[in-house]
Regions:
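Short, surface-exposed secondary-structure boundary micro-motifs
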Residues: 386, 429-435
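Acidic, glycine-rich catalytic/binding loops that coordinate metals and/or anionic ligands
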Residues: 254-293, 374, 413-428, 439-541
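Short, solvent-exposed recognition patches
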Residues: 21-202
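N-terminal signal peptide c-region/cleavage motif recognized by signal peptidases
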Residues: 12-16
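Zn2+-dependent peptidoglycan hydrolase active-site motif and core
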Residues: 340, 347-349, 363-417, 444-450
């Protein structure tokens, strides 16, 4: 696979002498082999490629056939692979045009037993799609008895990130797919079984979230997911895309205010509470601003801090004594989730954010009115009904990135149509801070926010801390001061909570964390073994 690397650059900002240097992400681009894709398209029955017909014209006709089921498929700058029976679809369209009934009355019959896509977004950076399947409806998968359809994700990347020090997961061949996709490899990383292959010069990734362990009731295990993935990959067909003349991507600059804020202070990225990492591992000292964005909370002040290792007041009490500046990173705090960017290989997938103290505190650590959450960027919503996680996905000529919000109430999100196929504008109200985690009042009143970027191993979590710092500076109109010395005693303010550094809370005695079934205590690197921890669908943090 040919790539065009883009060297990481420093942001042009007048940082203080002590502040860490803000970085831009390092990107690579796939060089798409459109002649090879054209040759593959030419063999599709029903397309009737004409002599001397150019590849753009052929793909234009192919896109016209597919777009009813894959909206805006022509926007993809890479060839789109999907489980769509394009040959039957083309034959049926010819029959319908001549007044002959087609062979399929229901559009879903074109998807080889899979449901029509729950999400599809194509653009200059590539495409991402989410399909689903009810295993009990498929003869060869009917022994996998689950009440809900299983989701399968597929991505084709023109733009992807090159992450420093990301551990290389163990790769295994899949003999059943080798003939069709030479070099395809299966791996397990960050809670997903993943299938990586290159075609037409483009890296593609198919992934299914699964539990790596013994069979459990109502839980998809990875040996079952493997069978579903093989069925899915065998159904893939080349169904669209458009050759595009695009310049190499240039990550946008994140502009910081020139004036210092008199109050906002923060510890640098990776400065998690001592002892709070998995096996005392440190945090991830990542100064990368992965994208310019709006801060996810509508109003300031807001506080980035630990929900576990910082002293907490009782339920329903005013939180002003708990949450104050300075901010502290808690990406890679000890959790049961695999995160490749964490030095210990396991940890917190994002950053917890607490809003200002409640105007009207209620019981069970809730607020009335609740604090509003807004879209950090203009983009496409990716979320199925009942799911707790909501993503905003951005796909343009310079970026491919997704932002995830957790702990909003699924019922309210369903009622307000915060679902796939909806687009939002930056700053648009999308919900409220809540306490939902698998159930109401399942966690403290806060927002979990994380960022995922595409890599040659698929979508992975990266440290959102500095991205949030810069977004918050934009919200308050002043640059924060990074702290390097040990926390000192906070000085009380007559007008509200302390604004100087607070004394660090002593973390609890180091304990061996309780790991989930299937996690290897002797392995600290995601993907080092197929027996590794997984995160529950759409509820990880």
């Amino acid at each position: 696979m040919k790539v065009g690397p883009i060297t990481g650059l420093l942001l042009a900002v007048a940082a203080s002498a002590q502040a860490g240097e803000i970085l831009r992400p390092r990107l690579a681009t796939a060089v798409v082999e459109w002649p090879a894709a054209f040759s593959a398209v030419s063999g599709i029955g029903g397309l009737q490629v004409k002599p001397r017909e150019g590849d753009r014209d052929v793909f234009k006709r192919l896109n016209a056939a597919s777009e009813r089921y894959l909206p805006d498929v022509a926007a993809s700058a890479v060839p789109v692979l999907a489980p769509l029976d394009i040959e039957t679809l083309l034959h049926d369209q010819v029959k319908i045009a001549t007044g002959t009934p087609g062979t399929s009355a229901n559009g879903e019959e074109y998807f080889f037993g899979f449901h029509a896509p729950r999400f599809f977004l194509a653009g200059p950076a590539g495409y991402h799609a989410v399909f689903s399947i009810q295993t009990t409806d498929i003869r060869e998968l009917s022994d996998i008895s689950l009440p809900d359809p299983v989701e399968i994700h597929i991505s084709g990347f023109r733009i992807y990130h090159e992450l420093e020090d990301y551990p290389t997961p163990e790769m295994r061949p899949v003999p059943a797919l080798e003939a069709r996709y030479p070099g395809l490899r299966r791996t397990y990383a960050e809670g997903h079984l993943r299938y990586l292959f290159t075609r037409f010069g483009v890296p593609y990734v198919v992934s299914i979230e699964c539990f790596d362990g013994r069979p459990r009731l109502l839980r998809l295990i990875c040996t079952q997911a493997d069978r579903i993935a093989v069925h899915f990959i065998n159904a893939l067909r080349l169904v669209g895309g458009t050759p595009q003349d695009l310049a190499p991507p240039e990550p946008p600059l994140a502009v910081r205010p020139l004036l210092l804020s008199p109050t906002f202070t923060y510890y640098g990225p990776g400065k998690i509470f001592p002892g709070s990492g998995f096996r005392n591992a440190p945090g991830r000292a990542d100064y990368t601003v992965y994208a310019p964005m709006r801060f996810p909370l509508e109003e300031a002040p807001a506080y980035a801090n630990s929900q576990i290792y910082r002293p907490r007041s009782g339920k329903g009490r005013d939180a002003s004594t708990e949450y104050a500046y300075p901010w502290r990173d808690n990406f890679c705090e000890r959790r049961g989730f695999a995160v490749g960017q964490c030095p210990g290989g396991i940890g917190h997938q994002g950053q917890d954010l607490r809003p200002a103290p409640c105007r009207e505190p209620l019981g069970n650590d809730r607020c009335d009115p609740a604090h509003n959450l807004v879209a950090v960027r203009s983009g496409a919503i990716m979320r199925s009904p009942k799911q707790e996680a909501v993503y905003i996905v951005v796909n343009n000529a310079n970026e491919h990135i997704r932002f995830r919000y957790l702990h909003m109430e699924p019922r309210k999100m369903d009622e307000e149509n915060l679902l796939s196929w909806r687009n939002v504008r930056e700053g648009e109200l999308i919900g409220q801070v809540s306490t939902y985690s698998k159930k109401e009042n399942g966690t403290t009143y806060h927002l979990h926010f994380d960022i995922q970027v595409p890599t040659k191993y698929g979508w992975v979590f990266v440290n959102p801390y500095m991205t949030l710092v810069v977004a918050y500076e934009r919200l308050i109109g002043g640059r924060g001061t990074e702290l390097f010395d040990a926390p000192r005693a906070a000085q009380a303010s007559e007008n509200g909570p302390t604004v100087g550094p607070r004394p660090a809370a002593s973390p609890p005695p180091e304990k061996t964390p309780k790991l989930r079934r299937g996690e290897r205590r002797d392995k600290d690197t995601p993907g080092a073994s197929e027996a590794f921890t997984t995160n529950a669908p759409n509820t990880g943090e």
